[in-house]
């Protein structure tokens, strides 16, 4: 049997659309309860179960209001999803999912059902199937094991449809027919009856058909006899035709032979003519070729061929030599390219090596300068002048390393001393902090205890204060209790319940008499209606005619002016529809134009935005480029600045070269003047007169030599800056070009495009405004006409109905002629109204007495409750007075503890203040130590780092110098210069060789051209001799053909050919006559066979036999159908009566155990046979109604019961139907079952439901789902052993529904 286990809901009604809003509910067995206030979303759960099981939406919605509103969610699209996990009738797990989509359009919401998914779990694996809605509906009905009507009307009945058992007759009949599946069985009986009638008709048709089949069978036998006779005549005719054919065959062969010889003669004659024509053409061609040649070769053919072949061989050898020269020339060109490439690479390498040599000298000078600077800074002796040797440099590094170690050691010692002092201060601070923290924790603990004790003390004092007035309250309670008991006794004594009950019995008897009188009047009214129906119909038709005339007049007066202004006249429906169609077409065309213009405007706006963005980018790019250019140049005159900078670099380069050369010259001059004892100036050869003059020159040269390196360094530094600036400016050349392009081309073009687009946009806006104005004029006219169309359609319908009414009035008037009745329907109806008024009065008195009984019972119950409450309060006060002394002692004890705690907290706070002052002082001393440590450490580190940086720079220069020497760059430079000279020599030799080959190739091309002319003359001679040979062959072939024709006897062949044709014609005529007779026989035979193949004669005997079998078989089948129809009809009646008896028994038991009123003993469903069914119609229909019984009286419950009785009756009928029809599905959902029920009936309903659960608790798949807002009703159900948990349905802060599982014990403590 099937049962539901779990369901998740997302995006349905008030359930949220986010994943976090998804609500999952697990269904308990046997009872699941959902509690919540109105609007929380309880009924939505029933709607979800119904939708996922049947695919039907709740009443009054087609789906769009079933999904969470997109406007509320502030979303365009809202997806809803419901998933259900359940067990099918076989106990297998099934998961089903249905999804929906609701989209918010401009004026309405659009709903769409998405594809559903059914998933089964077989052998631990999921098997999913995507299905359409109809397929899922069928699958769900199959899985749950109940019909769709039972699911909709019994198991998951919606709250709005819950009272359907008391609906009007037609709707009630339809519901019960669907539940009983009566329609299907009635259709089955109809089908059986129709089949039986069809089979009977078929028997008659078979008998008629057999008559004609017997005639066809006899006719077929006659045709077969005629075919046998004609086939014998045909055989004789065929032998005659064959004799003629044998005689004709040798004549045809001889004729064929003669025709072959004649065709051969014709062919030879044609060939001779063709050879004559070919001979003339060949002679003409030879003559033309001889005229074209200057002279004809006179030697033999062998001499001509040898001369031609030798000539060709000479030409081929020269061409091969020409190709070889061409290859050699290409090879030399390739070799020259490689040599040029190698020369370029060597030139680049030579320049690079020269630059490295210059840089090497610069590194040596920079190293010596740094050593002198650092030695002076560290006060090291022996390093005042350079250059320095390797030993001096090594000694310098050793001295610097020792100095670094001394500085590092001193700094480390100072840092260590300051760190020790800092750690000492930190330890002192930690000790004080620990002491302070301990006091703080103690204060917190004592304060917390103090707060608790103070709260406890206040509570005890409040209770004592309340108890002070308890003595007086006991006296008041005694007085109130005495008064309440007196009132209770008085109320019980004055109660008239028994009298009222007796009066109710009398009134019920009177009511029964009035009911009988009313039924008699109904019978009389029915008899009168036989004659008065016509009169009533006449009156109704006359009134209907007046009403329709008035309606037509109103419609015309309401729309006459408006339609006349639109069309110029008052139209009929067809004219107005045509006008609307043309107007709608005009509106659609206008809308299309407007949409197209809007699309063009959007495109233009987008283009404008794109152009604006592009213009803004270009302007920003121009500004950025100009700023960069100004930052580098200092002005906007880029070209002039660049030219001036190049001139400055050239000047600085010359100055650097001069300073570099001056250093070498000054050194050489000083050496010459000192080492060689030269007495004259090395530059001007002037002789020095004295030693002092010589020393003065040397001193001057040394001074210039000392200043030269600094000047050289300064010049090089300035040159590098200028070169860097030049490189930066050269790098900005493309940017300068971009600035020019932006200013002169790109930005002006964009501005022009922007102006053009703005003009287009303005034009489009004007067009759109014009179309919108037109649309605003036409659309109100169309809307106005549409409103009028509805009324015009109604008016035309009224006019047609008016004609029909007038015709019916005439018919009824003819029927009323001569009719005269004494007692009218109005008189009977008036008497019936009087009786009905009395009946209503009696019913009102019964209800009034019942209300009085209920009011008196409620008053007595209220007084009893009040008495019990006063007794309970008095007992509680007496108990509290006994605890008074204990609370006073507790007050004294608590006051003492509070005072003690206050003292302890005060002492602790006084100890904390001195600790905070000392701690602050230590913190200040510690920060001073840290500052001293950081300052001294920074100074020492800066000094050490400065030395390290300078040593690092010296090492860098030394490494570059060593690398240059170790790499052998000087030798490598000389080697590359030698290689360059060799490449230049090879390149010159290659050019000379190429020139020589070019001359040789020119000579050979001239020789080849001369040889080609001679070759053409030899070739023409060969062609001429070949054609002369072919001409001789043609003449020989012509002579041979003439000789062959002369040997044939042409005249004799033609005479014989003519005689043979005459003989053959005679035989053919005789043959044709014989063949004609043969074809006549064949056609007759074919005609008979064709006639025999016609439908009525083909297989006539077999058809006759088969039809006989069909007729006998159909007769037997018809008898069986008659038996089966009667059996099924009897079974349907039996099933219906058994089910109705079973349902009514359950309804009686449930009503008696639930309903606490005395006016209705029980209720039941009556199924009466349809009295309107004619005797000829064998279909049996049932009309259903719910009746209430008191004694022997049964009344229709519809229209007579109260709202509470209606709810209870509908609920009990659904319970009975579920008990009867849900054998495979033990699920039942009750939505607000306590609606309109009083407290007594609510309690009895709860007791009845518990009994139902108890009786079906052994059925493991029984599931009752109860939805209610009445927590008292839930508490009554919770007193049973079947409820431990229930669900609360509520709205969260986002006003989305939430489902929360709660314990049944939490009912009393829950606050809405």
Swiss-Prot record:
UniProt GO BP: chromosome organization; chromosome organization involved in meiotic cell cycle; DNA damage response; DNA double-strand break processing; DNA recombination; DNA repair; DNA strand resection involved in replication fork processing; double-strand break repair
EC number: 3.6.-.-
Keyword Cell cycle: yes
SUPFAM superfamilies, per the entry: P-loop containing nucleoside triphosphate hydrolases
N6-acetyllysine: modified positions: 959
Top-level taxon in the UniProt lineage: Eukaryota
Transmembrane domains' residue ranges: none
Pfam families associated with the record: AAA_23, Rad50_zn_hook, SbcC_Walker_B
Free-text remark on how the cofactor is bound: Binds 1 zinc ion per homodimer.
Subcellular location as annotated: Nucleus; Chromosome, Telomere; Chromosome
Required cofactor names: Zn(2+)
Family from the record: Belongs to the SMC family. RAD50 subfamily.
PTM per Swiss-Prot/TrEMBL: Phosphorylation at Ser-635 by ATM in response to DNA damage is required for double-strand break (DSB) repair.
Gene: Rad50
Chain coiled-coil ranges: 200-534, 635-673, 706-734, 754-954, 1019-1075
Native species: Rattus norvegicus (Rat)
Organism ancestry: Eukaryota, Metazoa, Chordata, Craniata, Vertebrata
Record note on domains: The zinc-hook, which separates the large intramolecular coiled coil regions, contains 2 Cys residues that coordinate one molecule of zinc with the help of the 2 Cys residues of the zinc-hook of another RAD50 molecule, thereby forming a V-shaped homodimer. The two heads of the homodimer, which constitute the ATP-binding domain, interact with the MRE11 homodimer.
Modified sites of kind Phosphoserine: 635
Keywords: Acetylation, ATP-binding, Cell cycle, Chromosome, Coiled coil, DNA damage, DNA repair, Hydrolase, Magnesium, Meiosis, Metal-binding, Nucleotide-binding, Nucleus, Phosphoprotein, Telomere, Zinc
InterPro entries reported for this sequence: P-loop_NTPase, Rad50/SbcC_AAA, Rad50_eukaryotes, Zn_hook_RAD50
UniProt binding sites for ATP: 13, 38-39, 41-44, 67, 69, 159
Domain Zinc-hook residues, every copy: 635-734
Protein name: DNA repair protein RAD50
Assigned GO CC terms: BRCA1-C complex; chromatin; chromosome, telomeric region; condensed nuclear chromosome; inclusion body; Mre11 complex; nucleoplasm; nucleus
